[in-house]
């Protein structure tokens, strides 16, 4: 997916988990895709091209500053891999600073403000402390604040004011950073739904497409994927390990929640909730067997349906 996005002009690649971002860097290196030149980046912290994309990651195991400074810490690996990192709290930022000092390098950081998702991000009343910490570290050359970012909670609900309210809180966050002497070169807020249905959020410097990259609509009641020009790009495949004939009235799987109304053929697929299939999918989730459309019957087991 990363290479496909780059071919279409993507200059940033967002990966949630730090360990995934490190793997992506290895993959890009093997494909001959190198990070932005360090000297050029120092001159232009927003620099990113489709040939030398930036990798941004935002979920990292919690570590203290002392742990972050250790040679094998994930944060030091991230800095060696030239990853952009997110900080929502002073504690996380201090860990990034410690890793940067240990690596004798500059960390490129995206500060996150919570504008209404109530997930990661500093509350507006706490953002000033985070900004002051960042400004001091930036003046010492340990970090560069690349961006202020946030995430939309209800962008798929196009007729309510929540997204506009989040945008206003985001702008307040920008002012708090400006008051601390931080001028961020990159601003990003819009998700797939924001990009599609809230142009004010998409008018910033970067949009983060998530569900849209998988070819799905954020809300099919607003617009179906095909109406948006989106096509699903993923599917899960497995071979049937057994096909058997059962009699009418025979219960299938735990609790016999589904019983055959007539004599039936059933097939066994070696995938279950241990592989990510929801347990709630029983008796309704669609399956294609060859070109024949059918559905899961009986409860989803750990390793079989």
Features from the language model and the residues they span:
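Active-site anion/phosphate-binding pocket segments in diverse small-molecule metabolic enzymes
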Residues: 7, 20, 39-43, 61-65, ...
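Active-site-proximal beta-alpha core segment in soluble small-molecule metabolic enzymes
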Residues: 1-188
């Amino acid at each position: 997916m990363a290479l496909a996005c780059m071919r279409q002009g993507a200059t940033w690649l967002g990966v949630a988990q730090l360990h995934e971002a490190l793997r992506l860097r290895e993959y890009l290196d093997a494909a001959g895709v190198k990070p932005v030149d360090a000297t050029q980046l120092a001159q232009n912290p927003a620099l990113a091209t489709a040939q030398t994309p930036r990798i941004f990651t935002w979920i990292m195991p919690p570590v203290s500053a002392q742990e972050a400074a250790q040679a094998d810490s994930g944060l030091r690996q991230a800095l060696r891999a030239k990853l952009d990192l997110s900080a929502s709290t002073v504690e996380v930022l201090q860990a990034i600073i410690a890793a940067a000092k240990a690596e004798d390098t500059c960390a490129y950081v995206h500060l996150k403000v919570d504008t209404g998702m109530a997930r990661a991000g500093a509350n507006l009343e706490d953002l000033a402390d985070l900004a002051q910490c960042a400004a001091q570290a930036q003046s010492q050359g340990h970090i560069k604040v690349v961006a202020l970012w946030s995430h939309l909670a209800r962008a798929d609900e196009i007729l309510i004011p929540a997204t506009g309210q989040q945008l206003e809180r985001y702008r307040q966050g920008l002012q708090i950073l400006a008051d601390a002497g931080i001028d961020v070169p990159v601003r990003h807020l819009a998700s797939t739904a924001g990009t599609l249905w809230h142009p004010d959020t998409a008018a910033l410097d970067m949009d983060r497409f998530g569900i849209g990259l998988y070819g799905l609509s954020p809300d099919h009641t607003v617009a179906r994927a095909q109406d948006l020009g989106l096509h699903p790009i993923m599917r899960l495949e497995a071979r049937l390990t057994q096909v058997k004939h059962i009699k009418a009235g025979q219960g299938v799987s735990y609790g016999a929640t589904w019983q055959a109304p007539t004599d039936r053929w059933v097939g066994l697929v070696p995938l279950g909730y241990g592989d990510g299939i929801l347990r709630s999918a029983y008796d309704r989730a669609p399956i294609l067997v060859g070109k024949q459309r059918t559905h899961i019957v009986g409860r989803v087991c750990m390793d079989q349906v």
